[in-house]
A protein has these predicted regions:
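Ankyrin-repeat helical core positions
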Residues: 4-5, 65
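Short, acidic/polar
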Residues: 1-4, 90
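Conserved, mostly hydrophobic/aromatic
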Residues: 3-4, 12, 38, 105, ...
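Catalytic pocket-lining loop regions of alpha/beta-barrel enzymes
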Residues: 10-11, 24-133
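Mid-to-C-terminal alpha-helical segments outside catalytic/metal-binding sites
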Residues: 127-133, 141-173
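Conserved residues at the C-terminal ends of beta-strands
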Residues: 15
Length: 173
């Protein structure tokens, strides 16, 4: 965290894959410090999501509730699996946006149906278009496949420009 103010640092990465849990009281002081540092330096906090255990959206979603009023929170992998995708695209992602939370996401590792469904939900609800960005999770991801699915889902118009360029620029430039 002491390097957070160095030139070129744009984000802090947070994962619970190796231990800890957002709702563990012993973790809360550390989380407070991480998010306070991010706020002080205007950094995004990347939060890794995956199905089940401590990285499940039901756990890491608390970070959005607690901190995304003042810090941009990037939920990597849009919930990390089918259950997370359904919970987020079904309403939670949009509920957070409506509540004023600074929540962003990418669709790396997204299950095949999600990009199209999410694009339709964004269109239907009229919000969220500026909260989704392209990411490929290289070297583990499928760049060509993820790019193609997202390009097809966004249709190459304004939503595509935001997803592939403008939202990233807003967060990280």
């Amino acid at each position: 965290l002491r390097l957070a103010g160095e030139p070129g640092v744009k984000a802090l990465k947070l994962s619970f894959l190796l231990g800890g849990r957002p709702t563990d009281p012993a973790c809360r002081p550390h989380l407070d410090r991480i998010f306070a540092t991010a706020a002080r330096h205007h950094l995004v906090v990347h939060v890794h999501t995956s199905p089940g255990a401590a990285s499940d959206i039901d756990e890491v979603g608390h970070l959005v509730d607690w901190y995304a009023d003042r810090v941009a929170v990037h939920l990597v992998h849009f919930g990390g699996g089918m259950s997370g995708h359904i919970k987020l695209a079904g309403s939670r992602f949009f509920d957070w946006i409506t509540a004023g939370k600074r929540v962003y996401t990418d669709l790396s590792w997204a299950i095949g149906f999600l990009p199209h469904w999410l694009a339709r939900e964004i269109e239907h609800r009229g919000i969220g278009h500026d909260r989704v960005l392209f990411a490929s999770d290289q070297p583990w991801g499928d760049f060509a496949g993820e790019y193609a699915r997202l390009a097809a889902a966004t249709g190459g118009g304004e939503l595509g420009d935001l997803v592939f360029r403008d939202t990233f620029a807003t967060l990280y430039d």
